Amino acid sequence: SNDVSWHEWKRMYNKEYNGA
């Protein structure tokens, strides 16, 4: 059930990466 965590992490990571 780590899929959700991974997806959420990647989403947040991508958002921060794009925001920067």
UniProtKB/Swiss-Prot annotation:
GO terms for biological process: proteolysis. Coiled coil: none annotated. Keywords: Hydrolase, Lysosome, Protease, Thiol protease. It is found in: Lysosome. It comes from the Eukaryota. This is Cathepsin L-like cysteine proteinase. One of its GO terms (molecular function) is cysteine-type peptidase activity. Thiol protease. Its main location: other. It comes from Fasciola hepatica. One of its GO terms (cellular component) is lysosome.
